[in-house]
């Protein structure tokens, strides 16, 4: 099943493979990380899992191998890893490119809002919070709750 069908890479998948390799979920083994070895969607999800595991540089290296790096999801993940490396303004640039492609992508708006909080721009973060509420149809969605937490806790992320 592909991540677009709701599966995400797990921490177990990350520890299975050494640096420079990527987990092939379908065939259950590690492959040398190179362009085209897996569909872009799978590579992007693996990159995001690397970033969530604090392996930001590896995440960016994986995203560099995408055949089409200019999807909303790939740009969001690049923004996330870049921001986590301390390059907040550069990360914001990737988030804004992602939003140009898909203005209704709630997760990128959450991460953009978190970046604004880090810069002290709470007003801009609250604008993203309002957009997320409209996208989700309520305030009862993970992206809204996570950004609301970051705003009220000076940029701290929920665990």
Which residues make up each language-model segment?
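Long, contiguous interaction/recruitment modules in multidomain scaffold/adaptor proteins
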Residues: 1-43
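Residue-level recognition of tetratricopeptide repeat
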Residues: 71, 105, 139-141
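Terminal, low-structured helical/coil segments at or just beyond the last alpha-helical repeat
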Residues: 126-159
